[in-house]
């Protein structure tokens, strides 16, 4: 039904070239004496922001949602937590941040609870090196057109397509064109995400793409890593074979999640080494077992070598 609805929407849209740009920034620091990791997503041309944070001792699985406003180098964020009640888990506002973005890309300010009777100092340092290369000084424009692509019913249907991304500097000069691809979009907006995906401190480019011929896992990214020496973005097709990935700036690893919807899950964790990436850990859960299988690897001679496997 979802796919049919999407096709119906496409028929109603008027063609317009639109490019959405979101920058993903990661911060490490403390609320009072308690270490936290915070992620903020900033949309170019908008003052709304969203993200999450977690206390290091609790782990990323206990992340707390954030949304708010970025204006005049000040960020105000409201946190939402799920509270257990007799009616189940209910989302409630449990606190807020009021932060100032410093010239060295620190965030300083306060956190206070919803009742405003508790208040703590907050200090956070950006993990990305924005002083060296700040992509907010650049603009991005897709070439978007209509084309026919085979859908999951094996029929050709009209979709918005992208085949080029032009990058301009603050002087409106075109500095690079990313091309050599031809992919469908899920709507009429081309989406760029700027995130450090190889953990060298510099923001890279992720281009969202859509697979109309799939029922599951119908979205992914094209990945372009910024080459500091060449001062340009270089496509990483090997990374694209893993499709939709999640990047952990604190631990400098990324993960691919797989699930079949029946209780079988497979998480694969990777690390970078010498401009390549390697499998370092696998976690498998099975629908017919209460135990989880863990497999650990070490990088030896440019290969992932299994060193340990256990259940718990």
Identify the function of each model-found stretch.
Residues 18-37:
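Short N-terminal segments immediately surrounding and downstream of signal-peptide cleavage
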Residues 196-210, 252-255:
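Acidic/hydrophobic-patterned starts of short beta strands in beta-sheet-rich repeat architectures
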Residues 24-26, 45-50, 54-56, 72-159, ...:
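Acidic, small-residue rich beta-repeat scaffolds with periodic aromatic anchors
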Residues 31-70:
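N-terminal glycine/threonine-rich, aromatic-flanked beta-hairpin/loop signature
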Residues 177-179, 234-240, 279-286:
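Beta-propeller fold detector
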Residues 1-22:
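Bacterial Sec-dependent N-terminal signal peptides
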Residues 168-170, 216-235, 269-274:
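Beta-propeller blade repeat segments, especially FG-GAP/WD-type strand-to-loop junctions
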Residues 188-197, 242-252:
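Beta-propeller blade termini
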